[in-house]
Amino acid sequence: LIRKGHERTVDLDQFYTADGIMPHAMESHELLKEIIIPLNNAQSAYKRLAYRSAIDYPIVCAGVLLRPSDAQKIQIDEARIVVGAMGRAPLFLAQASSSLKGKNLDDTGAFQKAADASMDSAATFAVHNVGSTLEYRCDMVHLMVFRALKAAAEAVQNSNG
């Protein structure tokens, strides 16, 4: 973030505040200069569900980052699961994310459990802000997280890094 005569760096987990009045740490006189994403062999995937995919606010969305533990790309060293359109800000799901550490990249059972945990966690923070039921949106969190996990795992396995 920059402003006249000053520049500062804010970690992403500190940038979003979950405050409806001040939803992020950027102040009115600051500009976003750059976003730095250190990948280190990690791959990501994003899935969203909307009534009309090109123009609508999503009913629910999920973003996943998976970093393999070694060059063989067998196990997960780090996972980050974030869901959007459920709360007042994107929700980083720490418990669901950490449950994948050490799991194999082809372990769909572990992905199902992480998707279950994601659904439960997101339901806690859910707000009624779109034209669908809360139950449906929670079910879709599970589906979007599971699909994003599978897509990110496939991207890791197919990457050249």
What are the roles of these predicted feature ranges?
Residues L1-G161:
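C-terminal structural segment of proteins
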